[in-house]
Amino acid sequence: MTRTISVIGSFKQHNREIQRTCEIFRNIGLHVNSPESAEIVEEGIDFVRFHTDPQACSDAAIQSLALHRILRSDLVYAVLPYGYIGRTTCYEVGRILQSKRPIYFSERPGDFPVHIPDAFIVDVARLSALLEQDDWCPEWLFSGVNNEEGILETRLINGDFVDD
């Protein structure tokens, strides 16, 4: 079965890098669920739309459709040149973590108040090599993490809220 991946990041700021990353993943045989297209409808607007997005849908509906594609992927890769993450990508990362889906990052996100273990910061070449190994299995960011941040994040997701 073909592995699936979604690539997220600031399409407004870094679409070229994101599309190059998508092409690398396609070249090793992965199916890229999201983004579905490389063609941006209008440059410079706050919420980027692609030509494959239904024109009649609101921005919120487009985002929800994208999240459906993202969350049904085997893993997600966040392309963050210079650590830039952006508002929409922050939102997506939060939903991905809450859904216990595997996510990896090209660079450590700046201005992002979640602990990212070093093992989840991997460049595209290293992640591609891992994905070509049949026995490699992507993990959720907090799987097996027993430090304070990992325990607190796991408790949040499980609805076991701390009374500080």
Please report, for each region that a protein language model flagged, where it lies by residue:
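Conserved catalytic or regulatory cores that recognize and/or transform ribose-phosphate-containing ligands
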Residues: 1-164
